Swiss-Prot record:
Keywords: Aminoacyl-tRNA synthetase, ATP-binding, Coiled coil, Ligase, Mitochondrion, Nucleotide-binding, Protein biosynthesis, Transit peptide. A motif ('KMSKS' region) lies at residues 606-610. This is Probable valine--tRNA ligase, mitochondrial. Residues 972-1019 form a coiled coil. Its EC number is 6.1.1.9. Its main location: mitochondrion. ATP binds at residue 609.
Length: 1051
């Protein structure tokens, strides 16, 4: 009796699992239904402990490498991360099974602003303190403790979702080696002239007191006057209104100019008014001056056809160069003074007035209006739609502020990155994003990389401050800020020693007593460290291709694929290409950019906690009740109104909660969505459907196992010689050549599947692979093949044909499980281990040294080039024709039974009358499938290739008559008649005489079927989420129902 291999808990050894052999399995020895918790438990730990995630040398063969886009350490993984890991892990597992040396590096991003904000909030809630109360050093200690906790949570989530990452190579963007890479990159880019310091307008968050990046800016559209509640402040502020203010003219003969502004509080920074040079209304104001209402200084009237639109408002624009991006450009064109009116915390500074100094700029808005009213200069308030820029991290309104910052010159690097894509050195999938790539990089601006935070990669720069040799005072102490910024000197260095060496190299100052160094207290933008991730995760700058050809840097760069969300193509992917190629001798960091779209809810809405439509992958995997969903919501930091809205959203979206679906179901569902579309509308019902698919896979496998029990060792060895050892082209295939028509058909279908799936992986179109795998198993394997062979396999005597069919069952299931494994790793591992193993494999499994060599994840992936998958190719057309004729016959007879209202249990006589040139072929096919045909249709089948109607001798059932009720043609070569017993015949004749008595119910039933199918097909998500083959089946069924209904109405 052959032996099977299983995974089992291992006691008293380091590995959680061991392989062992025992008697073959049958239906009674595994659980009756699929339980994802039981199936998925322990397997990941076994894989990891066995070292299966590490690259295995293949003696110079092909390699495949990826890095996981490092999740922010700030919290839990969301459904978008699950899509990323599903796609990436599927690619990794596929290439590992293809025999390549595979590396997938995990990592976490320190997420500067998000992490600092989260820890500050926790500090305030738990201790009532700010970071300033703790001081920089102690605050950073708390942040590191916090990140340790959350990084563990994230890594556990990645393991739960089956991500086969090499954890021994895990990195963190603030660990010692990555921090050194960041410092090195900054210094080298500074020395190359790519990093420089400049004073410009930036997006400033007063709450964080830092610059923020464009990706951290939320844009909120306000249509009318609204009192807006901001997370960063207790008081609401009015927005959506524009205020008209009068500016008195220096020339008393000129009428005041009326300006419109949504931000009256910025009036203290006004240094000019602008009019259009061709505006006839203001031709007398050319070259004139207005008087500032608060400081009473003269401010010029400038002519500017760029800033001013004559058709908008009054046609006069106030210019505040220090606090508006457009005004700044205008101020530069006309050499206007730049007056900053804000402190770092958003309060007004000394450039306002004594009355306003220290007042928050949003509180000052109403105070300024009141003061202008007292002066008689306030005219009116009007409704005015506006778009607000809000910090996504703090919820505060952003302010354009003039600040000295560090910048990266991007133009040359961007041009080179465009060239990489145009030359094909880097491929972008979907290709539609090539245009975005070119457009974004063509119009790129220099990148502000400094942040005024405590948490992040420190900037390795020092300001050189000259000192008075006599007084020992700083020489710039008496300079204005503008003068000081113009004269300041900067050097770079990882430490003060390096910085002093650079002082001498740059400025020729040898005497350390002539100056002092002041370390820059800012940190770098998180995207700077992330931009280095492909090379820093491989050991750069310590490891290079010149240093050691055996390191990861030499072996695995460039990465084969960089897979990530399309929303960060510019913010992250483009910067990786620019920075890594610049720092690595012009070499690209990866060959292919694979982008997936944003995941939305089933209604196409963006997922948001405030809408109650966010899907937590762990909730899908483990299941959660509606009550628990509501309880989690109640603990969130949403406002009370947002909680009310979100609760309604939860009740609508998940009225029964979310049932336990398991990891495999979630992964398979995500993989089935095409990634070349704009967005993915995720429907929980699809995941639940794939949970049922898992159960069907489980039950079908049990069916297969039940028929493998009585196979002998010779059969098993034949099976393994011909299937698992497919690379050996010399093995005999005699037993497969003698299999039945339906066996050959399923093997042909399997071969086609192998071709489609492999091609899908090569083209990075994984949804085609996933949909094809679903369709093959659901329809070809289960609905057709298994149903057809049940009649033969159920016979009490085990024939050679039955044995061959059993081997085909095992063979197809084995190949299918291996193809499905990258998408559904847990259930496939469990079921594959239950398949029979060859003697050689058992010997390997029993070897302590290499007892991990029989996991499905390191088995061979089915390859269309193997001889096993080339069988019957020369018979393909003939086999397809025969089986399709058989299936069409089944379908039509079933349809006729439904049309006539015949009970499934009613015994039929079915006569096949074969005519034409292919009588022998058709007769052979129906003879081979006769048992299946009779079992599936509860019938007796009589075959007459000579069109002879005298078939009574073939009828052994005395209760059946030869009165033909229904005759029809299947094809030009095949006609069929159906006969019933006398009682059924009388009933049918009665229905034909009084059709309305039976037709009313039939019409109603058909109309309901038609409506259900039509509604499903008309659903906008139908084409996106339903496999093409299933779509065709449903459309065909709909048309069939319509024809049946039409025929009834005719009668």
């Amino acid at each position: 009796m052959n032996k099977l291999l299983f995974l089992s808990k291992k006691s008293s050894t380091s590995n959680l699992y061991r392989f062992y052999s025992r008697a073959p399995i049958n239906e009674s020895s595994i659980k009756s239904s699929f339980d994802p918790k039981v199936v998925e438990e322990f397997k990941y730990k076994y894989w990891q402990d066995s070292g299966l995630f590490k690259p295995k040398s293949n003696n110079g063969g092909e390699k495949f490498s990826m890095v996981l886009p490092p999740p922010n350490v700030t919290g839990s993984l969301h459904i978008g991360h699950s899509l990323t890991t599903t796609i990436q892990d599927s690619l990794i597992r596929y290439n590992r099974m293809m025999g390549k040396e595979v590396l997938w590096v995990p990592g976490l991003d320190h997420s500067g602003i998000a992490t600092q904000v989260a820890v500050e909030k926790e500090l305030q809630v738990k201790q009532g303190k700010t970071r300033f109360d703790l001081g920089r050093e102690k605050f950073l200690e708390q942040v590191f403790q916090w990140t340790d906790q959350y990084s563990s949570n994230i890594n556990n989530q990645l393991k739960i979702t089956g991500s086969s990452l090499d954890w021994s190579r895990s990195v963190f963007t603030l660990d010692e080696q990555r921090n050194d890479a960041v410092q090195t990159a900054f210094i080298r880019m500074f020395e190359m002239g790519l990093i420089y310091r400049s004073t410009r307008l930036v997006n400033w968050c007063p709450y964080l007191q830092s610059v923020i990046s464009d990706i951290e800016v939320d844009h909120k559209v306000i249509e009318k006057p609204t009192m807006l509640k901001l997370k960063s402040r207790k008081k609401s502020v009015e927005v959506g209104a524009i205020h008209n203010i009068a500016y008195m003219m220096e020339d008393p003969m000129l009428a005041p100019l009326i300006v419109s502004t949504t931000r009256p509080e910025t009036i203290f920074g006004d240094t000019g008014l602008a009019i259009h040079p061709l505006d006839e209304r203001y031709k007398d104001y050319h070259g004139k001056f207005a008087i500032h209402p608060f400081n009473h200084e003269r401010i010029p009237i400038v002519l500017d056809d760029i800033l001013v639109n004559r058709e908008m408002g009054t046609g006069v624009v106030k210019i505040t160069p220090a606090h508006d991006f457009n005004d700044y450009q205008c101020g530069q064109r006309h050499s206007l003074p730049i007056v900053n009116i804000l402190n770092s915390n958003g309060t007004l500074n000394e450039n306002s007035t004594a009355e306003f100094e220290g007042v928050d700029r949003l509180d000052a808005r109403s105070m300024v209006i009141e003061k202008l009213e007292q002066m008689g200069l306030y005219r009116e308030k009007l409704a005015h739609p506006q778009t607000l820029s809000i910090c996504s991290r703090s919820g505060d309104l952003l302010e354009p502020v003039l600040k000295p910052q560090w910048y990266v010159k991007c133009k040359d690097m961007a041009d080179k990155s465009i060239e990489f894509v145009e030359s094909g050195e880097i491929k972008i999938i979907p290709e539609s994003f090539r245009a975005d790539w070119s457009r974004w990089l063509t119009n790129i601006q220099d990148w502000c990389i400094s942040r005024q935070l405590w948490w992040g990669n420190p900037i390795p720069a020092y300001r050189v401050i000259m000192i008075d040799k006599v007084t020992n005072e700083d020489l710039d102490i008496h300079l204005t800020e503008t003068e000081r910024l113009k004269q300041e000197k900067w050097v770079v260095g990882k430490n003060e020693k390096e910085a002093r060496e650079n002082v001498f190299k740059t400025y020729g100052i040898a005497n350390a007593g002539e100056y002092r160094l002041e370390k820059d207290q800012d940190v770098l933008d998180t995207w700077f460290s992330s931009g280095l991730f492909p090379i820093s995760s491989m050991g750069w700058p310590t490891a290079t291709k010149n240093s050691d050809n055996d390191n990861d840097f030499s072996r695995f760069l460039p990465l084969d694929v960089m897979e990530t969300g399309s929303d960060i193509l510019f913010f992250w992917v483009a910067r990786m290409v620019m920075m890594c190629s610049t720092l690595n001798n012009g070499e690209v960091p990866f060959k292919t950019i694979l982008l997936h779209p944003m995941i939305r809810d089933s209604q196409g809405r963006k997922m948001s906690k405030s809408l109650g439509n966010v899907i937590d992958p762990l909730h899908v995997i483990n299941g959660i009740s509606l009550q628990d969903l509501k309880e989690n919501l109640s603990k969130s930091n949403l406002s009370q109104q947002e909680k009310v809205t979100a609760t309604k959203g939860l009740e609508k979206e998940f009225p029964q909660g979310i049932p336990q679906c398991g990891t495999d179901s979630l992964r398979f569902s995500l993989a089935q969505y095409p990634i070349n579309g704009k967005d993915i509308n995720l429907d929980i019902s699809k995941i639940i459907g794939n949970r049922l698919f898992c159960n069907k896979l489980w039950n079908a496998s049990k069916f297969v196992f039940n028929y493998l029990v009585n196979l002998n060792n010779l059969s098993i060895n034949l099976y393994y010689n011909n299937n698992n050892n497919e690379k050996d082209q010399q093995q005999p295939f005699n037993y497969l050549e003698s299999t039945t028509l339906i066996d050959k058909w399923i093997l042909l279908k399997l071969s086609k599947l192998v071709e489609i799936v492999n091609e899908s992986y090569k083209s990075n179109n994984l949804s085609i692979a996933a949909q094809s795998l679903y369709s093959f198993f659901q329809y070809d394997f289960c609905d057709i093949y298994i149903e057809c062979i049940k009649a033969d396999l159920s016979k009490p005597i085990l024939s050679k044909q039955n044995e061959h069919s059993s081997l085909v069952l095992a063979s197809v299931l084995d190949s299918y499980l291996r193809m499905l494994h990258p998408f559904m790793p847990f259930i496939t591992e469990d079921l594959w281990q239950r398949l029979p193993k060859s003697k050689q494999q058992l010997e390997i499994a029993n070897s302590i040294e290499i007892d991990d060599s029989l996991s499905i994840m390191i088995s061979d992936y089915p390859n269309p080039s193997y001889k096993y998958h080339q069988l019957f190719k020369n018979q393909e057309i003939e086999i397809e024709k025969q089986v399709n004729l058989f299936l069409d016959t089944l379908k039509l007879i079933r349809s006729q039974k439904v049309s006539l209202g015949i009970n499934e249990k009613t015994k039929l006589i079915i006569k096949l009358q074969i005519i034409g040139d292919d009588q022998i072929l058709i007769k052979s096919s129906f003879n081979q499938l006769k048992d299946s045909f009779e079992k599936l249709l509860n019938s007796n089948l009589i075959i007459d290739e000579n069109n002879n109607n005298d078939n009574n001798n073939n009828n052994d059932n005395n209760d059946l008559t030869n009165i033909s009720i229904n005759k029809f043609t299947i094809s030009k070569e095949l006609q069929i008649s159906i006969e019933f017993d006398k009682e059924i015949n009388n009933q049918l004749n009665q229905k034909l005489i009084n059709p309305n008595q039976s037709n009313d119910k039939k019409i109603l039933k058909l109309e309901n079927f038609i409506k259900q199918l039509q509604d499903e097909i008309d659903n906008p998500d139908f084409k996106q989420r339903v496999p093409e083959k299933v779509q065709n089946i449903k459309i065909e069924k709909l048309n069939q129902y319509k024809i049946e209904l039409k025929e009834i109405y005719k009668k």
